[in-house]
């Protein structure tokens, strides 16, 4: 078959297949055009999930009749000046309008501030009519009807109207977060109305509009700079997480992106604080020299490529971790409110029912404290009491619930108070000056062990204890190969292993601070994790995560009875340890109930 030149209409339809995948793609391109035109108000109207109707109205600069005629031609744009190395606009290819016009019925009405009348042009399946004068206000109205009518095969791959409408809503949300100075309105016949009034420079207020007040109440500000790259935004506290990554938003020079490098850096930053299978909530904006980032790597401009990806990854991980450390033990207020609602009874008096007042951030059962700041007298706390956690437990030890020594009265003034009892051999009940604290002993000790190991990692190899008889662990050969390849790194953590035949590993030393532990279970888990890391980020940046795994295996278990001095030692260590308000998996280690809250539970005024 002879080679021949494709028609302009067919070329545009091919381009539409890359740029306009679905109605949401068309909405994104049209909203970007409006933003590039300086619009401060953008209204989007849809019908039939955007397939029947998609209209975008803005109050931007508008176009002259001559520019309008050029705008529907392929690769005609006002946003490039001969170089792809300095792109400062959202759009730049000049493909969106001709691509949409080739597969739909497109109408554009526009007017500039200097013009006395507007101009309109229509394109149907790639064929355009002449520009004609029309009545119009300053700005542009782009109306798309019967999207993909010229390529009916594409309609077979469209999702339901509800799904397509949801995709358009997500586009509007992302744009609204990126541009808080712009008012966005989305309306439709299928209850898809959204309205985001402009918030000026208050980015957190816009995020509250889009993500809800819960995010505002549980957000930590991010602001860091490294080698000319600046990262700003907000990230949720670890206990404010979701079951998917849909509420992770990233912007590069104002452009919404879904970049794998950025998303993996967010995961790495929360690796030791968010449970596996859960995802943190974050809105991050990266400002960088346009010459150091390539936005021309994907037709939809949703992916970018950085000249120095290591710099960007390090900046994101470091900035988030520093912010989390700065916030100390802050936990999600929503988790506290849900917990209280779960066991707070309805109050009845005769036929009257008095609803309980909702919890606020100020009355949340989670109370952050400054690590070390309030732990007066920790240096005098008997270290032997806490060191008992690393020793075998006497299951029959008595649970202290009787008298509390006079010294405990002073301990009640500490942030976590004085231990009064142990419930179900797992929860420590402590009394404070104005309420009580319930501590999960396993989660708390797990965090303390991890922090000890992490500190030791940066100073020297973790002290190890030799096993009298090496423990032999049978594993597949490929798992053995991975473990032996990283034996030197395990040694830094106090775990000494060596090959024992083709399909077994001998464990000769374990970390001394963990006492007796399930060495075989630990080795098997490490083998599983290594199998995943070898295809991901590598092991070098995950030593702390290994320390968290070891801490989980070696911390005091649920079901162990503790003496009063052991419980108080644990409380004092928690007060002196940064990040002790949550375990390595992101779960809270304690909750606090104010005396006033307890009285409210019983209907006392």
Curated annotation (Swiss-Prot):
Keyword list, A-Z: DNA damage, DNA repair
Source superkingdom: Bacteria
Family matches, as Gene3D superfamilies: 3.30.230.10, Histidine kinase-like ATPase, C-terminal domain, MutL, C-terminal domain, dimerisation subdomain, MutL, C-terminal domain, regulatory subdomain
InterPro entries referenced in this protein's UniProt entry, alphabetically: DNA_mismatch_repair_CS, DNA_mismatch_repair_MutL, DNA_mismatch_S5_2-like, HATPase_C_sf, MutL/Mlh/PMS, MutL/Mlh/Pms-like, MutL_C, MutL_C_dimsub
GO-annotated molecular function: ATP binding; ATP hydrolysis activity; ATP-dependent DNA damage sensor activity; mismatched DNA binding
Transmembrane parts of this sequence: none
GO cellular component, one term: mismatch repair complex
GO BP terms, alphabetized: mismatch repair
PROSITE patterns given in the database record: DNA_MISMATCH_REPAIR_1
SMART domains the record matches: DNA_mis_repair, MutL_C
S-S bonds: none
Similarity section: Belongs to the DNA mismatch repair MutL/HexB family.
PANTHER family on file: DNA MISMATCH REPAIR PROTEIN MLH, PMS, MUTL, DNA MISMATCH REPAIR PROTEIN MLH1
Function: This protein is involved in the repair of mismatches in DNA. It is required for dam-dependent methyl-directed DNA mismatch repair. May act as a 'molecular matchmaker', a protein that promotes the formation of a stable complex between two or more DNA-binding proteins in an ATP-dependent manner without itself being part of a final effector complex.
Protein name, as recorded: DNA mismatch repair protein MutL
UniProt source species: Sinorhizobium medicae (strain WSM419)
